Amino acid sequence: MHWKFSNFRKYHLSFHLNLFDLSLFFISFYCFPILYICFFNQVHSFRSTQPSLIMNKFDLFDDYSTKGSTIPLPNENFDQLFLSSEANDMEFLFNETLMGLQDLDVPSGYGIPQNTINNDFQHTPNKSKSHSRQYSGTAIFGFADHNKDLSINGVNNDLCKQSNKAINTQSVSPGELLKRSRGSQTPTPTSALPDTAQDILDFNFEEKPILLLEEDELEEEKHKQQQRMMTQSSPLKRVTTPSQSPFVQQPQTMKQRKPHKKTNEYIVANENPNSYKFPPSPSPTAKRQQYPPSSPIPYNPKSDSVGGNSYSAKYLQSLNKTQQIEYVDDIEPLLQEDNNNMKYIPIPVQEPMSYQKQKPVTPPLQSQNDSQQLEPLKTPQPQPKQQQQQQQPNNEQDKEFTANFNFNTFLPPPTPPNLINGSPDWNSSPEPHSPSPGRLQPPQQISPIHQNLGAMGNNINFYTPMYYELPVQAEQPQPQPQPHQQQHQQQQHQPELQNTYQQIKHIQQQQQMLQHQFHNQNNQLRQQHPNQFQNQNQNQNQNQTKTPYSQQSQFSPTHSNFNLSPAKQLNSNVGSMHLSPLKKQLPNTPTKQPPVTIEWSPVISPNSKQPLHKQIKESSPRRRIKKTSLLPPGELDNYWTGPDEDKIYTCTYKNCGKKFTRRYNVRSHIQTHLSDRPFGCQFCPKRFVRQHDLNRHVKGHIEARYSKCPCGKEFARLDALRKHQDRNICVGGNKNVISKPTKKKGTNNTQQQLLKTDTVVERIEKQLLQEDKSVTEEFLMLQ
């Protein structure tokens, strides 16, 4: 009789496993002899019992020492158990047992596809049909949701379906198992469990099991954290070294993580070193073999085919111990060595200093004609130490510099110490740069004249100090370039230099022509305007004493005003003597420039029949004057005469004879005779001779609505209405106002007192006539 594990479901057999039982299950699963004994014991006990009986919970994993003597122990003889009538019975039983694992969802040994290793939250495509396999944060050893179903990710439940990879269906016979167990006398350590398990249990596993050690995981996390801190702190302190991984003994990483390649990095401590030491540079011959001479040699730390530097840190430190160099600020001794193999020389930023270096004179390498053709460039010029040092390199350094860097560039003049934003230095000026050679900035190609100089050659020394003057103390004798060095450079770059020199000569000729024209025009202007130039020369001498830069900047070709229009060229050339380059604003006294005057020039058509003076008179702009008369011009002058000896004007219209002291008054008077009233009111049909009469009339229209008395009388002005009401002579008068008598002009207080006494005397006389004489006598005596 043969049985399958599917009978467990038929008879409702369930395995309630705890943590201890589960660990025993996996140990027995990897140790095949113990597992086989368990299976055989269950088969034997299941045959002897009734089918309706239910197994106890822990019968499968009971202690085998308490069982009967019929069950052999691992150290006992198994031959009596394996003897059978048929040779293939045990193999068939073992295969049936393995087939029963399908119903229990026990892992059957299919490997995880490579594309799902790094996907921690995605199930494999081969899902089980019996239950859904999901991850659980609290599940222990594959038991999802703490249920009875074993759930392990990456296991294909359907054994009937064909797998993508080849499946090894070869089983293990018990005889081979005993031979292997007898051959291994020592017990298997924990580190060898994956190999023995693979040999013993060939359950179609394609990948080796994973052995996870907590110590290795902690070391790996520390290593990754240290790498992350170093990359964040300083990327310059990472030097490639050969691979020295501390995790070589670990067979694999976690199955759900893809094993990533570790970069070969040498980690330097984040501390201040005593001195910086660099690996020795390779020989020039090796560089020439690797790279063509025209291409620049890039710096690649990972130049080996392996992907890292072949030198270790200790080896490099041991090499540098023998070659210890003290880096000092003074690099003069380093420059005097002839056979120095330094690739980069730190040049301090300071004022130019004299540097004298003698070399043996070699015979000239070029003909005399070529040297005579390039004679203008042999004139000694004040050059900084950096540029002289680059003109006289060694042979090896010269080749390396031409391949790597372009040191011979167009240098700007040295910056004076007291420059401001408006100074002629090309770094400090906010204005666009001039096209002169001394102010050229080669990377930006600003100048329209020297746009092609960058493509002519890389080893061109072009330095023309046009906008500055060196102080007397800083001028030191510089050694003249020796002829053999210049000829050596000419031989290397002869065609490029000749084209460049020709362009430079052409530019210098253009500058001379511009200066010559500029001087000629200034001389002509001096002859035409001698007074203006005398004042300008005085101001110019004052400015030159204050600014040493103004002498060379006055005749710069960048400030010639030849592109101006003819109307503005005169005044601009007059003031051009005081222009400085790029609106220089050095401390000086500002001079008043002559004002620019704009004059009106009439346009006269040649086909006109009128004479010239009439055309000019008619075409000239006139001021718009408001007409003061409607009569034709000169009509009013026919009716008046004057002024006479007394400066009096007399009206002669129809023997009027009125006399006026002003011409305006006599003309207005004649306009009244002729009814010439040009100023009309816009509110009524009245018209007036003079403008101020119209203004007074219009004011009356505006105030008429407010200047009407209740008595019915209207007034043109408000002040007239108020006077009328203050008199209190009508219904609309102000009764609360007491009218005061007006004083007559020319009367004194004494006269007024006399008048009062006269009136008093008259009243008294009238009373005396009415009364008795006695009363009057008494009254007179009292007085």
From Swiss-Prot:
Coiled coil: none annotated. It comes from the Eukaryota. A zinc finger (C2H2-type) spans 649-673, 679-701. Its main location: nucleus. The keyword Repeat applies. Keywords: Cell adhesion, Cell wall biogenesis/degradation, Metal-binding, Nucleus, Repeat, Transcription, Transcription regulation, Virulence, Zinc, Zinc-finger. It is found in: Nucleus. Residues 166-195, 219-311, 355-452, 474-497, 535-624 are annotated as: Disordered. Gene3D superfamilies: Classic Zinc Finger (3.30.160.60). GO terms for molecular function: DNA-binding transcription factor activity, RNA polymerase II-specific; RNA polymerase II cis-regulatory region sequence-specific DNA binding; zinc ion binding. PANTHER family: TRANSCRIPTIONAL REPRESSOR PROTEIN YY, YY2 TRANSCRIPTION FACTOR. This is Cell wall transcription factor ACE2. It comes from Candida albicans (strain SC5314 / ATCC MYA-2876) (Yeast).
